[in-house]
Amino acid sequence: MFGHRIVGFYHNQGVILGALVEIYKIKQGSGDTDAVHFLQQARAIADAAITMLVNENGILTEPCEADNGCDGNGTQFKGIFMRNLGYLCRTLREKNKDSSFYGRYQQFIVKNADSIWANNRNSQNQFGLKWAGPVDAVDASRQSSALDAFNAAIPFGSLS
C-alpha cells in the first residue's frame, strides 16, 4: 500500500490479513500487551481493500477482469482475500462482541457471497470470475474462489 492507494492483487491483502491475525493470536497467547497492534494493522488493510478494490456496488473486482486477462492464479485471488477477511472478522467478533468492530466486514462478506450466488452462477451451479456477474467461464480455480467466499459467509448467514 502506498498512502491510500492499494497496489497489487487481492491475494496480497488476503495473505497479510491472515498472517496478522495469526501473529496477534500468538502474541496475545503469550501475554504481549501490544498484540492488538496486529489487529489494528489488519483492519487498516481490510478497510482499504473493501473500499478501493470494488465496483460501484461494493463487489470485489479483480483488475484483470476488465479484459478477461486473469490466469489460473488470478482467478483465485478474491477467494484468498475473502477467506482471510472472514478469519479476521471471526477473530474480531470473538475478541469484542460489539459489532462495530466486525460488522462492516461481515456485511461485505455476505454481500459478495450473495452476489456470486445471484449473479455469477450458471444452470449447473458453477461459478465464474465476475462476482457481480455474468458468468464469464467456469473452471476449478473460479469455483474454488467462489467457495472461499461462501465459506467465509457461513458463520454470518448468506445466500438469501
Regions found by a protein language model. Give the residues of each.
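Intrinsically disordered, low-complexity regions
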Residues: M1-H4, S30, L129, S158
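Active-site cradle of extracellular carbohydrate-active enzymes
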Residues: M1-I23
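CBM-like carbohydrate-recognition segments
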Residues: G8, H37, R43-S160
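Oxyanion-binding "anion nests"
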Residues: V15-G31, F38-V54
